[in-house]
Structure formats: C-alpha cells, structure tokens
C-alpha cells in the first residue's frame, strides 16, 4: 500500500471515532475492538493520574477534517483544562484544543488551550521540574518526572507564541532541569527520575521499561518528539543537537524488520509500532524526510490494520510491566501515524502549532 493510500485509509478509520456516553477509545482489547475510558475518572487503581489519551482521539478527527466529532470529543475533555493535576495536559489539549483552533479559527478553542497551558505551568516545582502527577506537596510524588513530559511541552510552546509568557518559562525550566538527567551521552534515555527542590537528581529509573537502566522504546520516541518540538520552538542549537542524537540512536537500534521493540534492552517481547510512528512524525519536523519515509513505509507494510477490527496501527504495546495492551492498536499510535502521513503526503493541510499561519484544510478523503 502506498503512503497516499495509507493516508486515505487512516482518515477513513479516524472518521469513525466518537465519544460513547462520555467514554473515549483508548487501546484495543483481545477482540480487536476499542476499550473505552472516561477521561474524567482514574484509569485503574494503580494510577493516581487521570487517563491521558483522549486528546489523540480529537486530534485524529481534526486531522481527518471531521470537525463535528472532533468538537464533541474536545467538549468531553474540556473540564480537565482547569485542573493542574497532571503533566498530560499537553497530550490532552495540544491535539484537541490547539489543533481545533488551527483547524477552525474558533477563539473558544484557543481559550481552552491557554487555560490548560496555564494549569500545566502551575505544576512546575522550585527546581523547574514539572511534576508528573500527584499533589505538589505529596511526599510520594514530589519531584517525580518522566521523559514523556517533553512532548507534552508542545502545549506550552504554542501558548508562549500566543502570549502566555509563563508557559515558555516553564517549558524552558523543565528542559534545563531534566535534559542531562534523562538523555544519556550516547543519545539513549532514562524513562523516569526524581529531583530535589534544588535540582539534584535523587534517582533515575523506569516505570514502563524493562529495567531501571534500559531504554524503553516509547520513552525514547517521546524524547525525540519532545526535543524536536523544543528545538523548533526555541531555535536552540543545543536542543537541536540533542534531538538529532536521540533520533540517531533510535534509528540505529531498530531491528532488521524496522519495527521498534517495546524496550531496546529487553531480551524478547512484543513490538511497539507506536514508538515508530512518534519518531516518524518527529523526523519530518526535523527535516529528515528520507528516514521518516522509510520508517513510515515499514509501518504501513507490516503494521497497518486492513481488517474490520478497530484501530489503524497494530502491534503497539501499552504497559508491558503490568501486562496491559501487549499487542494492540492505540489512539496515540494512530494519531502520530496519521499526523506523519498528512505531513508526508499533503503537508499543506497539516495544522502545525509551531508554524506561523498554520491553518489547515482537511486531507483528501473519500466521500
């Protein structure tokens, strides 16, 4: 299947997404159908944060030009914007409210996204670290951060351009506090860390990876995407070099079939194609078109869902250490694949939070 054909399929699949009684698609279950979550309730008993994936449902619909359904999903998410409870406000409101504003020009989406950005900036600690989840005065969570926060900063970079100066300050401070702690000299990454209020690194390890010192594939992908966005937003040559180093490490570690494993240091286990989609999107933003297209072509050839089941990008892995979603489709994998396909095939239609005047029209799609 060619990339234009894959884009057509992706837009068609995205068009079927919708909220069901306030619940949103998340990952597919063993039956190949979407499992639904409320974006307003805890995902499971072990997670003190709230579900982080709903924005990617809205984002797919905006990218596919299905504005009515995208608006419905964004409305479901809206109560979260004023709740400074998680670093995932970026994932919730960059693909939903920011892309909604870019797609429609509606000022309400801009206001919603700015409210979410202000809430996210409130999670900054004296060290500059944006705490992942938990109350800022909760000793269990104080100072904890994960590399997944870096791509969440997209919301803050956009908000800075919209005049919210504290958003840019928070994003820069977080990167200054965490960059050297998470990015190893060879370009690989730690997933998680904990920081004292003075910035001292107290511990490093993982939440979703194979081992404390392993490189979790999606964490590496989040690093590539977050650093690519940061370098574009700031023009900082050191951040650009860091993004390039992380991307090169990721590409150099890919197995012969070109599909990322769930963890680059795990002796065996499932794939995580979503990590490949995230990196493909970032590579296009970095201007590495040839490498991005090779990665996209591999994912389309080996992981694209051509059956009647739900989801687009198969062979993704959600939370391996707890046995959740070991071989599934995910709404984030589908979002980043669709985003990369739009960027590669019809770049003029892609809404880009970091490009001036980035209003978009819907990609070509069947009637």
Residue map of PLM features:
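Glycan-recognition and catalytic cores of secretory/periplasmic carbohydrate-active enzymes
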Residues: 1-367
